Amino acid sequence: MSLLSDLINLNLSDSTEKIIAEYIWIGGSGMDLRSKARTLSGPVTDPAKLPKWNYDGSSTGQAPGEDSEVILYPQAIFKDPFRRGNNILVMCDAYTPAGEPIPTNKRHAAAKIFSNPDVVAEEPWYGIEQEYTLLQRDINWPLGWPIGGFPGPQGPYYCGTGADKAFGRDIVDSHYKAYLYAGINISGINGEVMPGQWEFQVGPSVGISAGDEVWVARYILERIAEIAGVVVSFDPKPIPGDWNGAGAHTNYSTKSMREDGGYEVILKAIEKLGLKHKEHIAAYGEGNERRLTGKHETANISTFKWGVANRGASVRVGRDTEKAGKGYFEDRRPASNMDPYVVTAMIADTTIIGKS
């Protein structure tokens, strides 16, 4: 085993200029992540200088067998925390050979919104709170829970410490450091209300980079959990009953909101979001109706309401923002399995462009 570990951690820069690039893309479910690696002649820092690649879309549910080739376009580069050295992770989006985005490629449409001159001028910032649940492999039951049984009621687990309250901290600390190494703008982590559930926060990130960073963060988390023999669930309500669900609260601000007088801009943006509540809910993740019940720190899925410091609202404004008269707000509706490209672009579209 020591030899295997030595080989896994081999520093290639001592013997070759070649590097390994791990190309990452979103699979056919719209939530599964796929990746494969290739050798490059030397270090690369600009995704535009990376070669396009292809994969068998018939094996990912993204193309028919008789015309199975799907093309990967490199879009963002991160340092590889697993191979280290000059090796890289590459976030890609996927296209047909004719250059058309495939249905699961939500990045393409998001990039158009974020390149709109009105959106560019407003420099939208995002902070995404990604919740997830760690499951025991093979039994689909939260980490730390007794097999076939339940732990004590919620209360002591949120930001808790101790072997009877925090389950999977080794995984959490590992991915936290791996994100920092990779260049992901992670701002923190914490244990969540339901035992076995955790959260990491990405941001503030500008525009399309928020989606790139969340997807690569999910990929790194999945890889670390794979090593640990644990399953990551992004289900918005993994356990029925009196247990908190899992969301992806999305904090948002524009340049106008961050400047003096920004509070009025925030109120107008919230009003726009309320007018398009149904459209946003439809795009905010599968199974969200099981989570947005009006209980467990959520608003009911059928109702839009906002409030200051209200975690039972659809949109929450912080006390600091109210006091300062400028800042940001939090859209609490997105589910943990949301596509960050869709959510971030839709919020910008509704609040800045205002045509969708």
Swiss-Prot record:
Q: Does the keyword Cytoplasm apply?
A: yes
EC no. given is 6.3.1.2
Q: Which domain of life is it from?
A: Eukaryota
Q: Which residues form the GS beta-grasp domain?
A: 19-99
A molecular-function term among this protein's GO annotations: glutamine synthetase activity
Q: What else is known?
A: Irreversibly inhibited by the herbicide L-phosphinothricin (PPT).
The record's subunit annotation is: Homooctamer.
The cross-references to SMART domains, in alphabetical order and at most eight, read: Gln-synt_C (SM01230)
Supply the name of the protein. Glutamine synthetase
Q: Which family does it belong to?
A: Belongs to the glutamine synthetase family.
**Catalytic reactions of this protein:** L-glutamate + NH4(+) + ATP = L-glutamine + ADP + phosphate + H(+)
- GS catalytic domain location: 106-356
Gene3D superfamilies assigned to the protein according to its UniProt record, in alphabetical order: Glutamine synthetase, N-terminal domain (3.10.20.70), Glutamine synthetase/guanido kinase, catalytic domain (3.30.590.10)
One annotated GO biological process:
glutamine biosynthetic process
GO CC, alphabetical: cytoplasm
Which keywords are on file for this protein? ATP-binding, Cytoplasm, Ligase, Nucleotide-binding
Protein localization: Cytoplasm
The cross-references to Pfam families, in alphabetical order and at most eight, read: Gln-synt_C (PF00120), Gln-synt_N (PF03951)
